[in-house]
Structures are given as structure tokens and as C-alpha cells.
Curated annotation (Swiss-Prot):
Belongs to the activator 1 small subunits family. RfcL subfamily. It comes from the Archaea. This is Replication factor C large subunit. InterPro entries: AAA+_ATPase, ATPase_AAA_core, P-loop_NTPase, Rep_factor-C_lsu, RFC_lid. It holds the Pfam family RCF1-5-like_lid. Gene3D superfamilies: 1.10.8.60, P-loop containing nucleotide triphosphate hydrolases (3.40.50.300). ATP binds at G55, P56, A57, G58, I59, G60, K61, T62. Residues 548-558 have a biased composition (Polar residues). GO terms for molecular function: ATP binding; ATP hydrolysis activity; DNA clamp loader activity. GO terms for biological process: DNA replication. Part of the RFC clamp loader complex which loads the PCNA sliding clamp onto DNA. Residues 468-607 are annotated as: Disordered.
């Protein structure tokens, strides 16, 4: 049930959103200017390719943009604060949409909602990407902002600025009455006016208040609005009038306590309007002097609040500033006075982009120099500004810190981007693209690469695949078998050189020469056919003479004719003592084929 009510409240706000520009409540002049800008896109690309709609929340800026798209029959692409709006995302979505036409040739409206809130690490580079897209867009772009000074001067110079003001209460009443008729709820004129006044110029809030009041009811009166409406805050301009024109301290304090302003903000309002109220032709300078005396004492208490974090002193500060301003006058000051917003806030708003840019540069310097932003802002900004005077060092600083063109202008104190600054920025971007500015990893981070010794020589044993011995002849020819010996049967050998082809060819061609002393290949009697034996060893571990005899003995395909094969047993046994593998060697000497395992037999791994 609760979920249904929440969905119902959200649905009401969207249900009566303006469908066309004619349905937008209030701001008729702003709507006309907005439509005139859009109509220029029908015939040509206008000089200002983007527009900024700025003003308080809930007055119809976003609704006007969507209503315009319906009136012009344009497609809509929107990026709001819930989306990630980094430079890459903006260029991928808005940039591609701005550079391409639709399938049927119609326009595409690109809406960037809450554009003044694109800042911080999450949206790094977003402002720069927006300015680049606006310069080359082929589609209309709408930027929506609450604070016009939250946008960079570069973007503001490229756009048409249209201000949307707060909707007047009298303009809200007909629209609220139309909503009541559509929902079947009767609401008196006085109740509708009360809802509109409570909204404070926010038409969206007025609709939400109407839904809250009409929930479960079919009839609304003024009495129902008092409990169903939102908390009503005192208007600051009405409060200023009560403070300066009243002689009752209690009423003035009640008016101040009803404000949605902290004492730190209220003191600026009184400071700005005190001379306007009392510095008139019929005014008294003593009233101004007395009023500022109380105001200075209130400021002392506010300073102690910040220093000691004791917010109980707000009470004393409020009494001094409000009662002092109300009771400092020696005579009443009738007539209408147009009170003004604190000029300090206007100046801060005008310099906000510069201060944000300064802090952003200080943050980059701090990350590069391992210092805090506060220290970099106070001590290193001037140093880096002097470094930018030299063009070569300016390119390196711009590339290393990742400075934007606007930040480069700020550090050099230039009002606009000169050709020299543009050249420095382009060179820095080229360095970044080529990766020349990236610092190489230290040697201890690199994987060790073994040095290659060209003089080193390694012998590789070939893989010898031995086939099964041929089956003995028939029983009748058993007595006519070949003479006993290790080479009594034919074997097929297949060798695979492990990288030393030239060494293998030399050993095959000159098997009986003395050059075999520099190379060695072991013939392994392996009882398992097709089993690979890979061994690598150094010839220095073997006696060259015995090794040469071993190779000559192994490569001999026929037994010696000069003597009995048994006469060769001593030399054969001597060779096997040094180089035979772990496999037992079959000794065929004599009539009975006995298996002999030589004593002190060594394997290849023993070398």
C-alpha cells in the first residue's frame, strides 16, 4: 500500500508534465525566445548552436526542452546527473549524436540536464568535452542549469542564455485547477491559491502538495491545506521589511527564526540592506553607525562559533544583528525599499569558476609533487606560473600535470587563448598521445632477462626412437643366428636435433674422425620402444678418449672381423662403466645370454 502511494505521487508529477510549449506555466518570454532559437535550426545552423536554460528548480526548464522536441518533431538524447558524465562518456554519446544526422534527415535535440554539476573526479574532463562538442555540433544542444555561474566562461560564450524565473502564484492556480478537474477532486480557489503560495514559485512542488492534500479526499478546503502542505518558510524579502520597519524586537526575531537561512547568511543580508534602508535623503547617519555597531558585535559571536564549535552562540548573534538593526533607528522610514541580495554572493558566484579552476590546478600540482591541495594552492601555484614563461618547460609542465587550455590561461594570467598558448597546449597533447611524458618503470620492476653468452656451447642429445627388434627366425634356423653381441639386430634410428643442426651433420659425416671429441651423442638401449630420452650434458665431464671409443663402438653396424666378439668385451665394459644409462645392458657374450650389471655403473645424471 505504501509502495502504491509512492508510485502514485511520482506518477502525478510526470502525468501532467507539459506536452507542448503552450502548456508550460509561466515564463512566456523565455518560452518565446527558446522557440525562436529552435526555428532557426529548421532552415540553417544558427550562429549559437547551443542554448542554456537556467533558473531555480521545478519551474519547467527540462519540461520546456522536451515539449520543444515534440513541437518540432525532433528525437531526444538526454544525459542527466544520474549518468556518468566524463569526457569519454560525453564524447561517445553526445558527441556522436551531435556529429551525425538522423535516418530521415530530422534534427536530434541533445539535452544535458544539470550541466552546472559536472565537476569532480567522477566527471573529469566533462566541461572541456562539452565545449568541444558545441563548437562542431550539427544538432541543437540544450544545457540546463540552476546556477549559470557553475558553467565555464568558454561554454557560456558559445551559448544563448535564457533565464527562467520562479512561477508566480497567480499563474499556478489555473494549471492546478485543471489538474483537479482531471483527477475528479473539487478544490476551492482559496485552497489552490494557498498551495501555490506555499510552493514558493516551484510548480512541481505545487503539484506534489496538491496530490498529498487530495489523497483519499474528493473535496479540498483551505483548512485541509494547513496540515497537508509543506513547511512554509518566511520569505527573505518580507523578513527584511519586518526587521527594518518594526520597532518590536520580538516580532523581528520571530520573522528571522522563520527564515531558512543560517545566522552566517542572515548577517550578509542585513549588512547589504542596512545602508539602503537608512542612508536616504531623510536618513540619519547615526542610525547607520549604531546599526553597524551591533552588527560587528554579532559578527564576533559568529567568529567564536566557528573557532569553538559552540553553536549556542548563534542565539546571541541573532539577537544582536536583528534587534540591533530594528532598534537602531531614531525615526520610522516609510515607503517601499527594494532590498538586494548580498553582493558578496554575487561576486563569489562570478568568481566560482575561477576558484574551482584554481583548486583543480592545485590538486593536480599536489598529486604530482606529493603535497596537499592547500599547500600547493598557497605555495606552488606561483612557482608553476613562473615555469610557464619558458616555452619548453611550459610544454613539459602542461603534459605532466594534464592541464587544460583554460587552466593554462589561468596560470599565465591570459584573458583569452593566444596562439602561443594554443601552440604549447597542442605540443603537450602530442606528447601525451605519444606517451613520451610517461615515466619509465624502475629497473627493479622489470623482469630479469638473462645475458646471452655467445661463447657458451651446449650439446643436445638427439631423441632416439628405437623400434622393436625383429622376431627371431624360424626354429630351424635358430642355430644359424647372428653372432652374439650388442649390435646383433638391425635398428632404425630417428634423430631430432635440438637446435644444433650443423653440429649433427658434422658428427654424421665424420663419425670416425677425431673431431668427434668436441661433440657427443649417446645411444641408449631402451627396452621401451618409442620412448624419448632427452639428455643434455657437457663434454668436459667425459674423458675424450673413452667418449670417442664409445661413439665408434656404438656407430659400428657390424662386429669386428679380426677377432671374436668376446674379445671386445673389456673395452665395451670400460665404456659402459662411464657412459651407460640406468637401464641394464644385456651381455650376449657366451652361449647363455646373461644380464650383467657392471659395478660402479654411472648414469648421465652422475656427470
Amino acid at each position: 500500500m505504501v509502495w502504491f502511494k509512492m508510485m502514485s505521487a511520482i506518477e502525478w508529477a510526470e502525468k501532467y508534465r507539459p506536452r507542448t510549449l503552450e502548456d508550460v506555466v509561466g515564463n512566456k518570454k523565455a518560452v518565446r525566445d527558446f522557440r525562436a532559437w529552435a526555428e532557426e535550426w529548421q532552415s540553417r545552423i544558427p550562429e549559437t548552436r547551443a542554448v542554456i536554460l537556467y533558473g531555480p528548480a521545478g519551474i519547467g526548464k527540462t519540461s520546456s526542452a522536451h515539449a520543444l522536441a515534440r513541437d518540432m518533431d525532433w528525437d531526444v538524447i538526454e544525459l542527466n546527473a544520474s549518468d556518468q558524465r566524463t569526457a569519454g562518456v560525453i564524447e561517445k554519446i553526445a558527441g556522436s549524436a551531435a556529429s551525425m544526422n538522423t535516418l530521415f534527415g530530422s534534427k536530434r535535440l541533445i539535452i544535458l540536464d544539470e550541466a552546472d554539476n559536472i565537476h569532480g573526479t567522477a566527471d573529469r574532463g566533462g566541461m572541456r568535452a562539452i565545449s568541444g562538442i558545441i563548437k562542431g555540433t550539427l544538432q541543437p544542444i540544450v544545457l540546463i542549469a540552476n546556477d549559470i555561474y557553475g558553467l565555464t566562461p568558454t561554454i557560456r560564450n558559445l551559448c544563448l542564455e535564457i533565464k527562467f524565473g520562479s512561477v508566480q502564484s497567480r499563474s499556478m492556480v489555473p494549471a492546478l485547477k485543471k489538474v483537479c478537474g482531471a483527477e475528479g477532486v473539487y478544490c476551492s480557489q482559496e485552497a489552490l491559491l494557498q498551495i501555490a503560495e506555499n510552493a514558493g514559485g516551484d510548480f512541481r512542488s505545487a503539484i506534489n502538495d496538491l496530490q498529498a492534500a487530495a489523497s483519499g479526499k474528493e473535496k479540498l478546503e483551505v483548512e485541509d491545506i494547513g496540515t497537508a502542505g509543506r513547511d512554509v518558510k518566511e520569505n527573505i524579502f518580507k523578513a527584511m521589511q519586518k526587521i527594518f520597519k518594526s520597532t518590536d524586537c520580538k516580532k523581528a526575531l520571530e520573522s528571522a527564526y522563520g527564515l531558512d537561512e543560517s545566522p552566517e547568511d542572515l548577517v550578509h543580508w542585513i549588512d547589504e540592506n542596512l545602508p539602503i534602508q537608512y542612508a536616504r535623503k531623510d536618513g540619519n547617519l547615526e542610525d547607520i553607525k549604531t546599526g553597524f555597531g551591533y552588527l560587528s558585535k554579532a559578527d564576533l559571536y559568529l567568529g567564536r562559533v566557528k573557532k569553538r564549535q559552540n553553536y549556542r552562540m548563534w542565539r546571541y548573534a541573532s539577537m544582536l544583528m536583528v534587534c540591533g538593526a530594528a532598534l537602531s533607528k531614531t525615526k520610522p522610514y516609510p515607503g517601499f525599499i527594494k532590498y538586494q541580495q548580498p553582493s558578496l554572493w554575487r561576486r563569489l558566484g562570478q568568481t566560482r569558476s575561477k576558484r574551482d579552476m584554481r583548486d583543480n590546478i592545485a590538486s593536480k600540482i599536489g598529486e604530482h609533487s606529493f603535497e596537499s591541495m592547500h599547500y600547493s594552492r598557497n605555495n606552488l601555484l606561483g612557482l608553476y606560473s613562473r615555469m610557464l614563461k619558458d616555452e619548453e618547460s611550459a610544454v613539459e609542465v602542461t603534459a605532466n600535470l594534464g592541464l587544460e587550455l583554460e587552466e593554462l590561461m589561468y596560470l599565465t594570467g591570459s584573458a583569452k587563448a593566444s596562439k602561443k598558448l594554443q601552440k604549447i597546449y597542442d605540443k603537450a597533447q602530442k606528447l601525451l598521445e605519444e606517451g613520451k611524458n610517461e615515466t619509465a618503470d624502475p629497473d627493479f620492476f622489470k623482469a630479469p632477462v638473462p645475458a646471452v653468452d655467445n661463447k657458451q656451447r651446449t650439446l643436445s642429445c638427439p631423441v632416439i626412437i628405437q623400434e622393436e627388434e625383429e622376431k627371431p627366425q624360424k626354429e630351424g634356423s635358430a642355430g644359424k643366428s647372428d653372432p652374439p653381441g650388442p649390435h646383433s639386430s638391425e635398428r632404425k634410428q630417428k634423430t631430432l636435433n635440438m637446435g644444433f643442426d650443423s653440429l649433427l651433420e658434422t658428427s654424421e659425416k665424420k663419425e670416425n674422425s677425431e673431431k668427434k671429441e668436441n661433440s657427443g651423442y649417446l645411444l641408449v638401449d631402451d627396452p621401451k620402444p618409442a620412448e624419448k630420452n632427452l639428455f643434455s650434458f657437457s663434454p668436459s665431464l667425459l674423458e675424450k678418449k673413452n667418449f670417442s671409443e664409445s661413439v665408434e663402438q656404438k656407430t659400428s653396424s657390424k662386429p669386428s672381423k679380426k677377432g671374436n666378439p668376446a674379445n671386445n668385451e673389456p673395452s665395451k665394459q670400460k665404456i659402459l662403466d662411464k657412459v651407460t644409462p640406468t637401464e641394464s645392458v644385456q651381455d650376449n657374450a657366451g652361449d647363455g645370454a646373461k644380464k650383467a650389471e657392471p659395478k660402479n655403473q654411472k648414469t648421465l645424471f652422475d656427470f
